Amino acid sequence: KPVFYRVLQGSIVDKTAFMDVVTASGCRECVIIADKGFYSKHNLSALMSAGMKFILPLREDTVNVEPEFYENTDDHKFDGVFTYNKRAIWYRKKASGNRGNFIYTFRDDHRKAELQGNYVEKVEKHYGEQPRHPMDVLKETRMGYFSFCSNMDKHPKEIYLDYKERWDIEQCFDYLKNSVSTSASHAHTDEYFRGWAFLNHISLLYYYGLINALRNT
């Protein structure tokens, strides 16, 4: 459930604001689960300097996973496999650098099949400016793969499940966007806006209280 909020000036860069909020919250025993785009050497260093645990998704073109790994079609390249919602999830865990970080790489075959199907369908319908052939899908070796950088030495399935919990955060954003009035966000005074933000936080607490009650019934 939401435990902290802070009003920041709109001129502050998102990534800078994030670290300011982490510092102000006094958060210690927690795990930072970010979204794609947050990972960078600067942000990674800031989190490690603050002593924070983290799970940071990497971009599809990340250099933290060697291209040969994607090109290798032998599934023995993985450390193992587990199931999630009746889907096979292949995984590999690899140490990164000398500061205790790991790169966790997963492949979801169900997701891979969806992406391949979408690719072939677009080719058949002649989407895009460049001429392509359906068999070009074989060149897209990274389909279905996703990777995380984390400083937690855990079984890959635990990392995967921890990241999946971010859905609760997405629900929070959806609630704020779709269920809470945004008219007050254009208030002309700081006091009015801060009051609106406080009521939003209280509203979220009640919302999550209801969600948790329904989950436990």
PLM regions with names:
Residues 1-217:
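Anion-binding and metal-coordination hotspots
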